[in-house]
Amino acid sequence: MTVDEFDQFVMLPENADRLLEYIGGEVIEVVSNQRASALASRFIGFVQLYLMQNRIGFVTGADGGYMIAGERYIPDGAFVSKTRQTEPSEQAYSAIPPDLVIEVLSPSNTPHEMRVKVVNYLSVGVTVWVADPDRKLVEVYTPGQPVKKVGIGGLLDGGDILPGFAIAVKDIFDV
């Protein structure tokens, strides 16, 4: 299936309630579980609280899609700065990539799919936070830098993207 065929496919009425990604020429249905969903909501909630005090952009949840490097992704959460996009798009998949993506690993994520997504996000300048509930750590992927692993005793900071944002990793996993 081509990306154009995918774009038509997701707009069919029977697909209206499905979360679909286009990765490596394949249609992947996003399937999560309650644990991953709760962690993603909690993680996004911390970013949202920060944004209430620092009105520098907006967050999208697990149904906000993005066009990334010719593919279509639906991250668990994403932050888009006002300098990149002033308000959320009404398109199913925004053509403007986010500044930051939050992914929470769940049993349906294959290591290959996640690697492809991270590489493609990085290729368009997106920072990626991958939360691993089993290992209780967050991997931070920043364009042009080595991966940083922040464990349960560490502090995750927003760097240049979310200046002044900091959260104890243990608080992310304390559900």
For the regions a language model picked out, list residue spans one by one.
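Gly/Pro/Ser/Thr-rich low-complexity, intrinsically disordered segments predominantly at protein N-termini
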Residues: 1-175
